[in-house]
Design a protein with these regions (language model features):
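Internal nucleotide-binding/catalytic subdomain
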Residues: 1-10
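Active-site "cap" helix and flanking loop/linker of ATP-utilizing ligase/carboxylase catalytic domains
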Residues: 1-2, 18-78
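Short coil/turn motifs at secondary-structure junctions
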Residues: 9, 22-24, 124
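Active-site lining segments that contact anionic ligands and/or coordinate catalytic metals
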Residues: 9, 64-69, 92-96, 113-118
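A short beta-strand motif that forms the metal-chelation/ATP-contact edge
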Residues: 10-20
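Short proline/glycine-enriched turn/loop segments at secondary-structure junctions
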Residues: 56-60, 86-88, 105-110
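Glycine-rich active-site loop/lid that clamps phosphate-bearing ligands
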Residues: 72-102
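Generic C-terminus detector
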Residues: 101-164
């Protein structure tokens, strides 16, 4: 896979090139289905006989629950307040929070911190998952020393079914 960044006047810059199967999403497969991709890859090298057993015990039509990874990007400013981001990290729906910056650090375009934060969230239904996602989109906040919002506002898109 390849990851790029684009900036007006600078064009496309390559950030990362890697032979990988998943980014952060492989952890979702484990969280939602109980199927560990890392274990599968290791079995492919060290215990080939285990692979059939792993697939036999797995049913893609019956997830343990619904899950998502909610990503947040930010403006290139110094972070002064992350209170809300840490409050969201403690939400009962969060299986794993990942806040990439520390207070006082400046958000950069690319590098070791690709996002402001991401949260692995889980729920018992798709509707509840959408509700939780909407709550995170509404509540997520990091501000700069002037109190200005750094977090780009995410929104759940509307999908319209058209009849032809």
């Amino acid at each position: 896979s390849m990851q790029f960044f684009w900036k007006p006047g600078k064009g496309i810059q390559v950030c990362e090139i890697a032979a990988r199967f998943f980014g952060y999403e492989h952890e979702l497969t484990d969280m939602v289905y109980g199927f560990n991709i890392e274990e599968l890859l290791l079995a492919g090298v060290y215990q080939k006989e285990k692979i059939s057993e792993m697939f036999a015990g797995h049913d893609v039509f019956h997830p343990l629950h619904h899950g998502a990874v909610v990503y947040f990007h930010g403006k290139l400013r110094k972070i002064a307040d992350q209170t809300k981001a840490y409050e969201l990290a403690g939400n009962e729906a969060v299986a794993k929070p990942w806040i990439f910056y520390k207070t006082g650090e400046a958000v950069v375009e690319y590098g070791p911190n690709p996002y402001l934060a991401l949260y692995y969230i889980g729920a018992e239904s798709r509707e509840k998952l959408d509700e939780i996602t909407g709550y995170f989109f509404d509540e997520m906040s990091m501000t700069d020393p002037d109190g200005q919002e750094i977090t780009y506002r995410n929104q759940i898109p509307d999908y319209f079914i058209t009849e032809e």
